[in-house]
């Protein structure tokens, strides 16, 4: 019966366990799209309510969306981004505004 250790085969080489490579989950940008009907005040309200922005930051993002057609509200994990998109779109519909929120991989 052999007296070899579990860590080698007797040829001077030791086995080393490979460290699993952990890949970070992809992040997603949540974006608002400009339209000609949603009041600017409502967009600021949405940014403060769902993205935790203060009034100054929300106004800056709203103006960016208004002038460029689209603006990033935040970057989140997929589940959080999907939830925020659904919440914003539902809130806009409940208030009879056509504001549209989307997401894409960052």
From Swiss-Prot:
InterPro entries: ClpS, ClpS_core, Ribosomal_bL12_C/ClpS-like. It comes from Methylococcus capsulatus (strain ATCC 33009 / NCIMB 11132 / Bath). The lineage of its organism: Bacteria, Pseudomonadati, Pseudomonadota, Gammaproteobacteria, Methylococcales. Disulfide bonds: none annotated. PANTHER family: ATP-DEPENDENT CLP PROTEASE ADAPTER PROTEIN CLPS, ATP-DEPENDENT CLP PROTEASE ADAPTER PROTEIN CLPS1, CHLOROPLASTIC. Signal peptide: none annotated. Belongs to the ClpS family. Involved in the modulation of the specificity of the ClpAP-mediated ATP-dependent protein degradation. This is ATP-dependent Clp protease adapter protein ClpS. One of its GO terms (biological process) is protein catabolic process. Binds to the N-terminal domain of the chaperone ClpA.
